[in-house]
Design a protein with these regions (language model features):
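Structured alpha/beta or helical-core interaction and ligand-binding surfaces enriched in interleaved
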Residues: 1-141
């Protein structure tokens, strides 16, 4: 097999494991009770950063919590999206960043899954407006 064929095969390879999935940029899961969720002025996400060596195990925990209706919606960057980067990001969404009780509840669910290190929460409105760094609203917990 020539190099071009192997590269095409690799780039089109699908895997349930984010660290090996080159078929798409993100894998996503929605809870059974989740309706339509769209990024907008009130949505936001907890961001979990993981190296390629740990992302599959971390994503398995998040998927299980989403499918069990303990979390609303989540996505993970795949090998395709993470090429040239230090690792992966898992985003765990909430509907309304102004609902502090829900933000902290979701954070506690993540803590119960073993994500005990400090995490950051980012509003989608800042991402959509390309506001980064000191000008973005960012919660750490």
């Amino acid at each position: 097999m020539n190099k071009q064929s192997r590269l095409e095969e690799l780039l089109l390879s699908w895997s349930e494991r984010p660290s090996e999935d080159f078929s798409r940029s993100w894998q996503m899961r929605k809870s059974p009770s989740c309706g339509i969720i769209r990024s907008g002025p009130t949505t936001g996400k907890w961001c979990i950063f993981a190296p390629s060596s740990d992302v599959d195990q971390a994503w398995a925990k998040i998927k299980c919590a989403v499918e069990g209706d303990n979390l609303l919606f989540a996505k993970v960057s795949t090998a395709l999206r993470s090429m040239g980067r230090d690792g992966h990001v898992i985003c765990v969404y909430t509907q309304d960043w102004t609902d502090k009780q829900d933000l902290l509840h979701v954070r506690e669910v993540l803590r119960s899954l073993g994500f005990v290190d400090e995490l950051g929460y980012k509003r989608d409105i800042d991402t959509l407006k390309r506001i980064y760094g000191p000008d973005e609203w960012y919660l750490r917990a």
